[in-house]
Amino acid sequence: MNEFRLNLLQVLGDGSLPRGYYWYRVVAILPDCELDLANTLRVYAPFRGNSIGLFWDEVPGAETYRVIRRRDDEEEGSILVSSPAFFHDTGIQEFG
């Protein structure tokens, strides 16, 4: 099995995420199953009003990915993202 990586692209001050630590995980949605990429990325957002950019290795056959986010004081939530394998978390997206 291939090893897929989840990577931090950038942390910027152009969003609405509060300062603190964020944990992200990505699950690839394939036609017949979901593939948990089994890696977690911990990111520190140092400012008030942050945004966090993530990218990961594309999974062959996946057209959608579930990005899972958790923060110290929040329950885990997720959002669906279409390819390409990139997500810019500005804090205004609805994580369910």
Model-derived regions, located:
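Disordered, low-complexity "stalk" and linker segments at domain junctions of extracellular
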Residues: M1-G96
